[in-house]
Amino acid sequence: MWGLAGGRLFGIFSAPVLVAVVCCAQSVNDPGNMSFVKETVDKLLKGYDIRLRPDFGGPPVCVGMNIDIASIDMVSEVNMDYTLTMYFQQYWRDKRLAYSGIPLNLTLDNRVADQLWVPDTYFLNDKKSFVHGVTVKNRMIRLHPDGTVLYGLRITTTAACMMDLRRYPLDEQNCTLEIESYGYTTDDIEFYWRGGDKAVTGVERIELPQFSIVEHRLVSRNVVFATGAYPRLSLSFRLKRNIGYFILQTYMPSILITILSWVSFWINYDASAARVALGITTVLTMTTINTHLRETLPKIPYVKAIDMYLMGCFVFVFLALLEYAFVNYIFFGRGPQRQKKLAEKTAKAKNDRSKSESNRVDAHGNILLTSLEVHNEMNEVSGGIGDTRNSAISFDNSGIQYRKQSMPREGHGRFLGDRSLPHKKTHLRRRSSQLKIKIPDLTDVNAIDRWSRIVFPFTFSLFNLVYWLYYVN
């Protein structure tokens, strides 16, 4: 009962107020009363001195700021900056602009801003900024009856963002926007984020091709220079790079090219043209990928994560080419060279021995035999020739073979020849084995290729495991 009566009383007393507000609004919008608004604006601007800040000589002016981010257009690693388009709004109170008789806010033409005092705000890490001017200059001045001024701008700024690219492209970057007063110190002006943590909006709408915004932070502090202490506001973005683009454009091609270089291990080692062409092609392709990547990044003095990976892939590709060079050397180089050297050495020794022996005949009539003659005589001996009366084979400690002319008794000579025959055969076999040329085992090139088929994939897999565990975590 009492609630119903109270509601009626509230309606009775509030009705005149609503009627007055509506009448006031209608009177302002009425063309006949536009002269009153014009007189009010003229009165506010008459005698207004833009050279003096509000409450000059008194407490500092408190300037609140809001930012509505329209877009982040580009993040450049080459120039170490990013481009941001935003609606930048500043609020402060200027008692000289307070008015009465008009219960509405006055949104004035943007050119009025040139006749009013505005904060000397600038972006500390700005490289290039501009206020949009299509179709007119994108700025706004709105006056409130209590003298509060809203000054809004649509700005595109390119701000510096110093990046640490050691973990590129598995990195996270912090890019900031530093807002500061250029001339007024903290004795004259103070900055604050209007609305606290909600002072910046539009972050959730931003979509970047290579980054994801993990978080943003707002900071308010004072910085001290030689000319005094100045207020500073900071908007910081934490950007995490999306790895998908780099997997498709860099990592996967590098992995496939590295695997392609291992195909040469399955190609026959005497197919030089195929293996060399494959090795050189993969090396040049890796070089091209490295060159293209360096063109898209700044010239920095430290090694990046992607440099480590591409260098590792390049090493594997280059080692695959060197593996065939080693196989080629074993098959076509070292083996024949060793065989040729041994043959030349043996021939030279044989010629020297033949030449020296041909000129030597001792006093007893011993005749020097060559290895070939010894071999022929042994064939005769093994062939059943048992008559050793005319000749006998003997060896001295120097390994020189002699045929001694002698005429032993028939029975005694046959007995000596038969008894010494096994000993002579054994000794001749041992001496003739020393004359054989040791031909290298050329089948080891197949073993090199077989081991390469196992070692290269295993070490490359281990390299990938260590790389991704280190940089991802």
Curated annotation (Swiss-Prot):
The chain crosses the membrane at residues 247-267, 272-292, 305-328, 448-470. InterPro entries: GABAA/Glycine_rcpt (IPR006028), GABAAb_rcpt (IPR002289), Neur_chan_lig-bd (IPR006202), Neur_chan_lig-bd_sf (IPR036734), Neur_channel (IPR006201), Neuro-gated_channel_TM_sf (IPR036719), Neuro_actylchol_rec (IPR038050), Neurotrans-gated_channel_TM (IPR006029). Residues 268-271, 329-447 are cytoplasmic. GO terms for molecular function: GABA-A receptor activity; GABA-gated chloride ion channel activity; identical protein binding; transmitter-gated monoatomic ion channel activity involved in regulation of postsynaptic membrane potential. Residues 26-246, 293-304, 471-473 are extracellular. 4-aminobutanoate binds at Y122, E180, Y182, T227. One of its GO terms (biological process) is memory. The keyword rRNA processing does not apply. It is found in: Postsynaptic cell membrane; Cell membrane; Cytoplasmic vesicle membrane. It comes from the Eukaryota. Disulfide bonds join C161-C175. Potentiated by histamine. It is a multi-pass membrane protein. GO terms for cellular component: cell surface; chloride channel complex; cytoplasmic vesicle membrane; dendritic spine; GABA-A receptor complex; GABA-ergic synapse; plasma membrane; postsynaptic membrane. Histamine binds at Y122, S181, Y182, T227. Keywords: Cell membrane, Chloride, Chloride channel, Cytoplasmic vesicle, Disease variant, Disulfide bond, Epilepsy, Glycoprotein, Ion channel, Ion transport, Ligand-gated ion channel, Membrane, Postsynaptic cell membrane, Receptor, Signal, Synapse, Transmembrane, Transmembrane helix, Transport. Heteropentamer, formed by a combination of alpha (GABRA1-6), beta (GABRB1-3), gamma (GABRG1-3), delta (GABRD), epsilon (GABRE), rho (GABRR1-3), pi (GABRP) and theta (GABRQ) chains, each subunit exhibiting distinct physiological and pharmacological properties. Can form functional homopentamers (in vitro). Interacts with UBQLN1. May interact with KIF21B. Identified in a complex of 720 kDa composed of LHFPL4, NLGN2, GABRA1, GABRB2, GABRG2 and GABRB3. Interacts with LHFPL4. Interacts with GIT1; this interaction is required for synaptic GABRB3 surface stability and inhibitory synapse strength. Beta subunit of the heteropentameric ligand-gated chloride channel gated by gamma-aminobutyric acid (GABA), a major inhibitory neurotransmitter in the brain. GABA-gated chloride channels, also named GABA(A) receptors (GABAAR), consist of five subunits arranged around a central pore and contain GABA active binding site(s) located at the alpha and beta subunit interface(s). GABAARs containing beta-3/GABRB3 subunit are found at both synaptic and extrasynaptic sites. It is linked to Epilepsy, childhood absence 5: A subtype of idiopathic generalized epilepsy characterized by an onset at age 6-7 years, frequent absence seizures (several per day) and bilateral, synchronous, symmetric 3-Hz spike waves on EEG. Tonic-clonic seizures often develop in adolescence. Absence seizures may either remit or persist into adulthood. GABAARs subunits share a common topological structure: a peptide sequence made up of a long extracellular N-terminal, four transmembrane domains, intracellular or cytoplasmic domain located between the third and the fourth transmembrane domains. This is Gamma-aminobutyric acid receptor subunit beta-3. The lineage of its organism: Eukaryota, Metazoa, Chordata, Craniata, Vertebrata. The gene is GABRB3.
